[in-house]
Amino acid sequence: MDKASALTALRAHQAELKQLGVEHLFLFGSTARGVARDDSDVDFFFDHPLGSIGLLELIDVKAATSRVFGHPVDVMTRRSLHPILREAIESSAVQVF
């Protein structure tokens, strides 16, 4: 999926994702860079209110974004980004909402 299509699809589901606790959603990785292949997964990280997300809520966000694309996604919170990779990921990320 190309970057523009991914952004459009995600923005169409903004209300649903916000109900799941997603305050801000960011696209990163090959889709954000415009180099995704047909077999590429789609990578996201998101911000949420502190203390409001647990494993089950994270699974719900992953399931919701996976339904948007119909194939695998990687979803994580901003706080869970690896410290060594965080700066590179954040600098290349595209804010969805």
Locate each region found by the language model.
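General secondary-structure edge motif
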Residues: 44-45, 69
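Catalytic core of pol beta-like nucleotidyltransferases
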Residues: 1-24, 33-38, 50-97
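A short, structured beta-strand/loop element
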Residues: 38-39, 44
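Short hydrophobic/aromatic beta-strand micro-patches
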Residues: 28, 45-47
